[in-house]
Amino acid sequence: MAEFPFEISPMFEGERVRKEGMFVELGGPKSLGLELVRAKPMDEIEDDKVTIVGPDLKEMEEGKTYPWAMIFNIGGELVEPDLESVVERRVHDFINYCQGIMHLNQRYDVWMRVSKDTAAKMDSFEPFGQAVMMLFKTELPFIEKMQVTFYTEQAEVEKQLEEAKAIFKARDERTKDLHDEDVDVFYGCTLCQSFAPTNVCVVSPDRVSLCGAINWFDGRAAAKVDPEGPQFEITKGDLIDAEKGEYTGVNDIAKKLSAGEFDKIKLHSFFDAPHTSCGCFEVVGFYIPEVDGIGWVNREYQGMAPNGIGFSTMAGQTGGGKQIVGFLGIGINYFYSPKFIQADGGWNRVVWLPSMLKDKIAETIPEDLKDKIATENDATDIESLKAFLQEKGHPVVATWAAAEEEEEEEEEEEEEVAVAAAPMMMPAAGFQMPAMPMMSGGSSGGIKLTFKNAKITIDKMIISEKKEKK
């Protein structure tokens, strides 16, 4: 192995470069970040070449954030365009093998940091680029030639980003006419387990990976060329619930790969055994109980959602490979799925989106709902959201009256509990029963005691009327 100014090992996966230990930040929420892999003819690739357009590492100022784009060109007899996204997703793996260099997210959301210790050992991104390409060709031998260009100049990054978005869109559209019921196998991905050990990403025709980078065709291509790699085949097994997207094969793999943490995953459910969330997801969904609706916030949105929480905080609550009822991480392309959270109302349950996300996915939002889904321009808190939904006649409003009626009925059923029939449970030491008003029993005489949501155990109770002293 060639000599590099930093150590290279899988042991560094999951290493975090904190702000206080950071030399520079590349991309991320404060700037632009991109990674893209392109299949090219062999004669168009200068093997192992690293090109830097813009300031190199030694020209960067400590503590600053810079725009960042990585464009990898790959070639080989077995290399084809279908493999681009597969190779692209491994960028996350191999960069994180490099000590002191942190990589998060994917596509147009890339966020990297270089530690002070690592920056002190190298004055250019060139050895970093050579190290990553060495790892690619070692782990994926079908790549025979490879070169990379790093962009750190704002205008160039913006240009590369626009071109890349068109490429990503074309990739995503390939699965539009293929659905879960049309195939016998799904695909799994464990790339994010270095950061989220119990995450089990299941990719089906109707559900893109959480990071948005792997669709069903990409999973198939990856499993074919690298059978021992992080993308693999999942036999669907028997269908348990079509609406929720539950299959025996998916449940089996969920239990196995989460080390028993979860025993089922329902692909199209928000509330019942939802898909696990890693941390690389593009969008996080959050339940708003006050309106019985679901809001969604994307990684790029810097403001607060109506619940008073921003993306980063919600991502922390949702991620880590957990199965959190009330929060759900997804890839943006899942919005285009005909099975989008169909078990819980689909689009009829969506009540809030940041305007930038709403504009981005406008073509897939049902026409009759476009004006009924609020943005930060319409609602910034729960009260204003509720008022907006009522004014626009959003479908969730109809559920509010039904829920209130059901609650009233439950309260009436619990209204009266006879003392003699009350379930008994010994109160804690020092517990004192609250004073209860004496009520006239009318023609029937006696008193009435009302206990709500109470479990009381008493060996003996004596209730007597206290007579006034004369």
UniProtKB/Swiss-Prot annotation:
Pfam families, A to Z: ACS_CODH_B_C, CdhC
Domain of life, source organism: Archaea
Catalytic activity: Co(I)-[corrinoid Fe-S protein] + acetyl-CoA + H(+) = methyl-Co(III)-[corrinoid Fe-S protein] + CO + CoA
Gene Ontology molecular-function annotations: acetyltransferase activity; anaerobic carbon-monoxide dehydrogenase activity; CO-methylating acetyl-CoA synthase activity; iron ion binding; iron-sulfur cluster binding; nickel cation binding
Pathway listed: One-carbon metabolism; methanogenesis from acetate
InterPro entries hit by this protein: ACS_CODH_B_C, CO_DH/Ac-CoA_synth_bsu, CO_DH/Ac-CoA_synth_bsu_3_sf, CO_DH/Ac-CoA_synth_bsu_arc, Prismane-like_sf
GO biological process: acetyl-CoA metabolic process; methanogenesis, from acetate
UniProt cofactor note: Binds 1 [Ni-Fe-S] cluster.
UniProt keyword DNA-binding present: no
Binding site for [Ni-Fe-S] cluster: 189, 192, 278, 280
Keywords: Acyltransferase, Iron, Iron-sulfur, Metal-binding, Methanogenesis, Nickel, Transferase
Family affiliation: Belongs to the CdhC family.
Function: Part of a complex that catalyzes the reversible cleavage of acetyl-CoA, allowing growth on acetate as sole source of carbon and energy. The alpha-epsilon complex generates CO from CO(2), while the beta subunit (this protein) combines the CO with CoA and a methyl group to form acetyl-CoA. The methyl group, which is incorporated into acetyl-CoA, is transferred to the beta subunit by a corrinoid iron-sulfur protein (the gamma-delta complex).
Protein name in the entry: Acetyl-CoA decarbonylase/synthase complex subunit beta 2
Organism: Methanosarcina acetivorans (strain ATCC 35395 / DSM 2834 / JCM 12185 / C2A)
